[in-house]
Each structure stands twice: as structure tokens, then as C-alpha cells.
Amino acid sequence: MSGHSKWSSIKHKKGAADARRGQLFSKLSRAIIVAAREGGPDPAGNLALQNAIEKARSYSMPKENIERAIARGSGTDADAASYETVIYEGYGPNGVAVIVEALTDNRNRTASDIRHAFDKNDGNLGTSGAVSWLFERRAIVLVPSEGVDEDELILAAADGGADDVKLDGSTYQIVAPPENLASVRQALEAAGYTVESGELTMVPKTTIELADESAAKKVLRLIDQLEDTDDVQDVFANFDIPEQVLEAVAS
């Protein structure tokens, strides 16, 4: 798991009572509304909607909120029609590659906010294609490792269409093609496994190790500021932070 994924997991676990929860649910709802608007209300034939729903479930968004967002998107919601997906790419401190996915109704505002975050944190916002070649789109499902038989987990994951299972600390990371996200989660849950999270992500082909606290803090400040931007849905980066450094930064 990349350092960004580990950091996101730490914030996820700490975030149940966090003041950002309302903002997070608003972002998740917006993603569901727009996905349903653009691709229809049936997740089976709408990969973007599948991902939006899986991500919302991973953050314990109530089922009724998810259903309400789908209904809004499949109706005549003017807000949904006004939003578009925009991808931004750039470099952070220490040459870390960063991809930002946003849903916006005002490109100029969003670009300004994201550029400000990069500039403030020793980064540079680049042009389209600047860093995307360093990543590949994958589905990632996380399962707590406690009490799990790895061989049985691999079989269940394969039944759902996964092509790799890795143990990372106290969590199994199940990797699959993007279109198999929902089927992998369903297969694991049907086999009795607890799914901690499941979403589409950009997996770095190579990573940059941030081996000291100072370097890690600089990059994480940029990631946090980008994720706190209202229009931003996802941030992906290719850094890796050793466990002991990440624990020190998170404490």
C-alpha cells in the first residue's frame, strides 16, 4: 500500500467524529448524483456510480443518503447537470507525483484553489499528462487480517474477479480490474469477510520513499490541503512512508 493510502486509512479511522464528516458526505453525495446523472441509476451498468457508492459505503454513509443521491441524479437535478469532472496533475515536495480529481461547476475557481495549494506547499501544478503515466487505475478492497486464512481469502477474492492479494501490516489489500470492484466486494462479504473499504484508485507504478518526518510532513500537508478543497473528490500520490515515520507523524 502506498504512503498516501496508509495516511488515508489513518484519517479514515480517526474521522468518525471529525468536523470534516459533513463536508465528506457532501462530496460523496455529489459524486453519486453526477455519476447517476451521466450514466444512469443502475450501478451494474455504470462503473462511475459503482465506485461512488462503494466509496460512500466505505465511509459509513447511511444507505438512505446513498439512495437519495441516486434518486436526485436520475431525476432532473439542475445541480448535477452543472458539474463536470476535471483532472489536475502536478508535483509536490521531493518530486512526489500528484493527481487530483475534482467535480466542479466553476473550472476557474477550482483551478485557482488547487494551484494555491500546490504553490503554498512547495509543489507545482503541471499540465494534463504530466504525471498520469506514473499510475494505473485499479480497484482496491481492504480486509482486516485478524483471524483470516490467507488461502481461503485468495479463493474468495478470485471468485469475485480479483487478480492479487497482499498482506500490508494488519490489512489485506485485494487488487482487481476497475470493472470488478463491486463483484469482489460482494464475493468477499458473501464469504463472511469484513470489508474495511473498497474503491477505485490510481496505483503508482513506482514510489518515492519519504524516510524522515520533515519530508513526510511537507507532502502530507499538501495532500491534506488538496483533500480539504470543496471541489476535490480524490487525491492520488506516489510516495511511500515507512511505518515508524508515519506513526510519528500521525501521533
Which stretches of residues belong to each language-model region?
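N-terminal cationic and glycine-rich segments that engage phosphates or anionic surfaces
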Residues: M1-G126, A130-I140, A250-S251
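Positively charged, low-complexity, intrinsically disordered RNA-binding extensions
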Residues: I140-S251
